[in-house]
Design a protein with these regions (language model features):
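C-terminal accessory/tail domains of diverse enzymes
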Residues: 1-160
Length: 160
């Protein structure tokens, strides 16, 4: 399999030292030349637009659909802030893909909990972010496979 120019570029960026200055990161991001003054630079078309950091000094997330629903907008903003906060506060990272289980809703819910979106105040955020994913966010596998639930059902049926 032949690597594309983009694949080579991604590998080079991931291999960079974690102790880079912003200027070194800028040089690496633009492949050795300063593209921060180009408004429509090709590096801006990713979910996380770092071109915006060098061009305007802001961070831009380009992975959300437009919406007028206040709850969905709040959920998207909260998710972006939580991921940004984790990136700032995290001391170590591991570039490893998490395998998607047969239940994407459960996998994403555990990710949200790891980000700190726990508790009643984030219940609505989790609901909006999980509503379109297939599967049960509370259970990794089908509920009927859990012995504890089967025992509970049996006890309830015997009590009747």
């Amino acid at each position: 399999m032949i690597d594309t120019e983009e694949d080579v570029y991604k590998r080079q960026v991931r291999a960079l030292s974690p102790h880079l200055t912003m200027e070194q990161l800028k040089q690496a991001w633009y492949g050795g030349r300063d593209g921060s003054f180009d408004h429509y630079n090709w590096t801006r078309y990713y979910a996380l637009n770092l071109h915006s950091v060098f061009y305007r000094g802001t961070l831009e997330w380009r992975c959300f659909e437009s919406t007028l629903h206040a709850g969905v907008a709040r959920a998207n903003i909260t998710l972006a802030l939580a991921i940004s906060a984790q990136a700032i506060n995290q001391t170590r990272t591991l570039a490893k893909k998490t395998p998607v289980t047969e239940n994407p809703a459960f996998t994403f819910r555990t990710f949200l909990l790891r980000l700190g979106l726990v508790g009643e105040e984030y219940k609505n955020v989790r609901m909006h972010l999980l509503k379109d994913l297939p599967g049960d966010p509370a259970w990794r596998y089908d509920r009927s496979q859990y012995v504890c639930l089967q025992n509970r059902r049996t006890e309830q049926q015997e009590a009747r």
